[in-house]
Amino acid sequence: MIPPASTRLTDVQLEFVASVVEAAAVHDHDVLLSPSGGDHDRSFERIVTGRRVDGVILMEILLADPRVDRLSQAGLPFVTIGHVEHPGASWWVDVDYAGLISRCVRHLADLGHQHVVLINRSDELVAAGYGPALRSTAGFLEAAGQRGLTAHNVCCADDPAAGLACFEQIRERWPGVTAAVTINEAALPGVQRALHRAALDVPRAFSLTGVIADRLAEDFYPPLTAADVPARQMARLAVDLLLEQINDPSATPRHALLEPAITLRSSTGARHG
């Protein structure tokens, strides 16, 4: 399994890794963790050229991802959690970020919100072409345009301090914003602190929604109206697809684009004022 090269994985990324290990163990397979990207390119290349594994699961996919091209050239079975811009005949599992974020925006519009913001992932990930960030942006802007909303997209690093600073920046630059959509679960504790510091009651004075793993959405106060990132289901599907390839190299490539329901909790409400 190839997780992202990072000094610290987010809680959801760790859940993906643990879920892949668990799903592989059911089939009596072991999992080798090896990061890729940046200084880890040689490690990735050793796995590809040395055939040290039967197959690969890639995480954190870019729209144009050289790792995908390299594995395709090598003929090594692989599945991506996420998908490139033009996946063609490949094996992958993903969440429909564009569709889900679009639905979040429409939900806010139905509640009367007219000025909204997307709290996205980091500048670095967006610049690199990280799939969920760019697809979320597209879904957000398209839905906002269709509903005639004033919309802003801001990047935020994956940590609480960045979430706090990001939300305070939003309040300073666009005081008319009454609702936010996010895919950045790691920034949520900081966003919550910023809401408290600004004395903004959720959802009476401000609404918040997005694509966030259920357990994190439920830990927020008040619990977030959000679509789940079903890490265990996605990991299980990725392992199943990889084993299908390994057992039958001639199998027709398959993929799964998941569209979890948006669970209405307590963080969105009608716009006031």
Describe the role of every protein-language-model region.
Residues 29-30, 77, 114, 150, ...:
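Residue-level detector of anion-binding/catalytic polar loops
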Residues 1-106:
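Alpha-helical recognition/docking segments in bacterial nutrient-uptake
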